[in-house]
Structures are given as structure tokens and as C-alpha cells.
């Protein structure tokens, strides 16, 4: 039952990790608000602090633990939720006695009551981890109904309207949860579960709500967006959904993220590359370029396949944005494999390259593989690839000088300069475009036409111009 205003409890919500976690946090904030709670990001005057953790790789786990310990310094009870909490549960609770409770995804529907128990000093059982892939049928088409029956995270439980936690013109919109791929290095499916799509009508309804709150760009997120619809009986559901999202009143741009190269079919490439209102932007999870390394990773493709894919994309959309992440130092990787990765990156002309050093993840196949590379060698290879990537990304930005861009404004300086993102730049994770000579009266969330006149590392500088000159 919702609390009265006088008795309204309060919670600070701290979010770490990826955009999917940001959506989870906003759903939890909306749920708590519907129960009469006040939710804020300021932990200075609240009853409890909730930290939505990330458990993806070693560095993310460390950041989450640091955030949990830091939150305890304000003298309020601290509760861990999110991926790290779901993945490690009681083990995490035992190692961090400073934290009042560790709750898994299955506690989300009853979160308000769990937090009330913590505030009141009542004992709250720590989460017991379970491999969430085992909770759903193997056949994807049977999953949505079963997910609803068992209250699987994000399915069957319809959250209250999200509470947006900032006024950004960009909003993240979740397409699905879970993943069916079995990459040797990745533990995500074990705690996020098997892949389950959200019904298109639900995605559209949330997109309209986000537009009504001031969102101008919708960024679609999931663990694997190319799989969207395979469990709904329509493996091309994303091709049908994108134009409908782009047609929502108030939405200037729709962007798809988390694309698997091996599943990127020609019809989806064409839809992303040519649909009005959809950013010609390809967030491609290559991970490496050596065929041998990729096979050990339990992934498909190789450098030649990836270059062919990029070539096809650029035939349809010559100015398309393309980004990827790569893992360096995977077990068995040789100097020749690293050289092949270097050749691929040089030929790929990517706008953004994320470089990660391999680290063992509990419960993964790769953690048990022979051929481990020592940390010092991995660090040297990471630095080598990162230096090359920085050089290549800077050159790619220089190559865009002279291009016409439409910039979604995120900030307006007192000088009148604007900062935002063009279609080839994803908010928060990619570079930005600074617009000079902008007309007066431009506000955050507006779109400005401009032409690129310079680059600053990966970032661009553009001069505002009339639409017919862009």
C-alpha cells in the first residue's frame, strides 16, 4: 500500500554498469514511487541507499564493490541489487558485512517491502544464486509464456511506469533480456538468463511514454538485439518495429545497439541503414579478428567476413557509424593473432574501438581453458592495441571533416556553443560533436544542422548551417 506523504520513506539509487542497468534502475525507481517512496540520486538525506551493481568483468566488479563500501560511509543502510548481487548473492553478503542486504532479480517485485525490512532492522535473507538459463525452456518460442508464469525477471511482472532519473533528451529502451549465445568468456547468460523478447506493443508503448517525458532519441538495448523476435515467432520483428518507433511523435532518432555480426541479416542491415529516423549506426560485437581465437571464444566469423560486412553496410550508408569492442589476451592468443587484429582494425575504419584485456570469469568455459597468458603480457598487448585504436579513431574523425551532420543537442554553453551527438555517435559511450556559430535560442533536446569543419581527437567540431546546406 502506498505510504502517506508524511511517512514517505526515501531511497538513493546508485547505478553502475551498462545502459540495461540504467533502465532497471528507472523501473525500480518508478516501482518505489508508486509505493509512496521518494527516490533520488543524492544519498545525503535518505533512509536507505540502493546500489545497482555490475558484475560483467573484474574491473566492473571492483567498481561495484567500491561503490557499495563508499555508500556505507553516509551512515545509512546499504542494499546491493543488480548483476553482481544476483551473480554472487550470499557469497557477496558474507564478504561485505557492511552491506545490509544483497538482493537478486527475483526480489524486485517486492523490493519496497524488502527495503522497509532493512530500514526497520528486520533480517533479510541474502539471494541464493541460480543459473537462470535453466528457468526457461530450451525452445525460444516457448519462453514468453513460461517467463510470465514463473515471474521471470522482466517478464510476467509488469513494472510501474519508469521514473526517469535525469532530463536527458536520450532515453534507453529495453528490447529483451538474456542471451542464448555461449561465448566462452562471458558469464552474463548465467545471471541474466536465456533470451526473451518484449512484445512489440510493450516496447512501442514505453517508447511513446519516453517521448512524452522529453526523450528525443531512443537507444534500444538488450544483450543481443539481433535476436529480437525469434521467440515471438518472427525473426524479422526488429525490421518491422524500427519504423514504428521512428514514427512516434517527438522522436528524432532511434538507435540500435548490441548487434551480433553472425546474426546480422541483410534485411536488418538495410532497415538500419536506410529507414528515415533510424540512425545508420552499427554497434558490432567483433571481439577479435583471428579465426582461431574466435573459434576458441565460441564465436563465428573472421577478419575477412567482418570487412565484407562493413563493406555492405557502407554501400547502403556510406557515412554510417560503426563501433566495436575487442578482447586481447584470450587463452591461446599468439603474436600472430594480435598482428591479424591490428591489420583488421586498420582496414575496418571504425569510429570507436573498445579494448579490453582478458580476465577469467567464474563459471565460464574460458576460465578452464589451457594456454593462459600472463597478466604482464596481456597488459602490453592491451596498450599496443589501444594505442593503435586511438590513432585509427582519430584518423576516422578527420575523415569526417566536410560531412553534413544533424546534432542532437545535449548541452548549451553560456558562450552559445552546443555539444551533442550526430547519428554516427552513440550518447554516453562514443565521441561528441561541438557546434559553433549556432543560432540563438537553441535548447537541450533540439536538433541542429551543421557541417564538420575540424576534429579534436575522436570528437568533431561543426559549424551550424541551414538545412538545405547540410
Regions found by a protein language model. Name each.
Residues 239-240, 247-253, 264-324:
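Radical SAM/AdoMet-radical enzyme domain recognition
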Residues 89, 222-232, 263-267, 286-298, ...:
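Flexible glycine/acidic-rich beta-alpha junction loops that bind and position SAM and/or redox cofactors
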Residues 1-228, 267, 276-278, 282, ...:
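Proteins enriched for Cys/Gly/acidic motifs involved in redox and nucleic-acid/cofactor modification
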Residues 55-60, 215-240, 244, 248, ...:
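Conserved glycine-rich "GG(E/T)P / GGGxP" loop and the immediately following alpha-helix
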Residues 2-3, 368-470:
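Terminal RNA-binding accessory module
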Residues 233-246, 266-280, 333-350, 375-380, ...:
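Short, electropositive alpha-helical surface patch
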Residues 256:
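Intrinsically disordered, low-complexity polar regions and short flexible loop motifs
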Residues 284, 325, 345, 353, ...:
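Hydrophobic, well-ordered secondary-structure elements that form the walls
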